[in-house]
A protein has these predicted regions:
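Flexible loop/hinge segments at secondary-structure junctions
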Residues: 2-12, 16, 24-339
Length: 339
């Protein structure tokens, strides 16, 4: 997913709302001035390190490449290790920024005081499948998806699925569930949605970055889940939309609260997030209650969420931070949410 394409689902007004006063928050020292261009001698590189969610990794890597083209002395390294790892490294101050698909819980916010949440993108969690001969047309309700991941629906030709898909030839084959094996913001988004649409899921499993999966195979990262689904027949999983676009993987149309079955796309994710900027916390407050799942609207895809860049209001709390790095990080952040 390119940065230019993703502008259709980045709500710049949200970013401006949150980071409009960013220069007042991101402090290094009394001599640091926001907007003063970072300068360095030829070959005097400034290294910025980040880690976290694989959910927005295609976007983040593309942004880094674009930024380096016009800022060749600033090298931004991002490790796609999952939201749990990003939050942990942000809290431990071993990276300059983290990225998480889930906002910090109140307890995590307390462990990392003066953290900022900066929404850098809005993305969709999709349900890819691998059924030979079925490339399009599969429809699923939230309850059916929950029952599949609970291990209660075990065959592709289960009556619950075939009744909903009379024109799709579904095989008498066992469903192979693929889920994340690592702490994951994608899992948090997906399980939060399942908990909203299925009382059984809420009671038996609940929502979280890491849950006790009732069934299935584990794989690390969105890349791992996508790889297992793409290479193994009769599988089903959950991944971020960008990984489907990259691999042209079949995905299910999911039922939204208005009763429409909607395929994931940049347009339907944007529709779900429309108006999200009307009632958001400031960047320096807790975002633990923020979600945009199951948004109203006939064309709204139901499993949509922000990804958050995590920074400290005072960057000098990070042990290896210096003034050049602070300026470079601030300039990249402002570029990422404005351009």
């Amino acid at each position: 997913m390119s940065k230019s394409n993703n502008n259709t689902i980045i709500f710049v007004t949200i970013a401006i709302l949150v980071v409009g006063g960013l220069g007042g928050y991101l402090l290094f020292g009394s001599n640091t001035e926001v907007g003063e261009k970072t300068e360095s001698k030829k070959n005097d590189f400034i290294d910025i390190n980040g880690a976290g969610a694989s959910f927005p990794f295609p976007l983040v890597s593309n942004m880094i490449e674009q930024y380096f083209e016009s800022n060749p002395t600033i090298r931004i390294n991002y490790q796609s290790i999952g939201s749990g790892g990003g939050v942990r490294q942000h809290t431990e101050k071993t990276v300059h920024f983290g990225i998480s698909d889930a906002p910090l819980k109140d307890s995590q916010f307390a462990d990392a005081p003066n953290s900022l949440h900066i929404p850098i993108t809005i993305g969709a969690v999709v349900v890819p499948y691998n059924i030979p001969g079925v490339d399009t047309g599969l429809k699923l309700t939230g309850e059916i998806v929950a029952d599949i991941f609970l291990g209660k629906i075990t065959k592709w030709n289960d009556p619950a699925i075939t009744t909903l898909n009379p024109d799709v030839e579904l095989p008498d084959k066992a469903i192979v569930v693929v889920h994340r094996s690592d702490g994951s913001g994608t899992s948090f988004i997906f399980t939060s949605w399942l908990a909203e649409v299925s009382a059984d899921w809420e009671k038996e499993v609940g929502a979280g970055k890491a849950v006790e999966w009732p069934t299935g195979l584990g794989a690390a990262g969105n890349e791992g889940v996508a790889g297992v689904v793409n290479s193994n027949e009769y599988t089903i999983g959950y991944i971020e939309l960008a990984y489907v676009i990259q691999n042209n993987t079949p995905v299910a149309a999911l039922e939204n609260p208005a009763g429409y079955f909607v395929l994931p796309s940049l347009e339907t994710a944007s529709e779900a997030a429309r108006g999200a900027g009307d009632d958001l916390p400031s960047g320096k407050d807790t975002w633990s209650k923020v979600e945009i799942l199951n948004s109203p609207g006939s064309n709204s895809y139901p499993v949509v969420s922000f990804s958050y860049m995590l920074l400290y209001q005072e960057l000098n709390v990070i042990p290896d931070m210096d003034e050049k790095k602070a300026k470079a990080l601030l300039e990249f952040t402002l570029w990422a949410v404005h351009d």
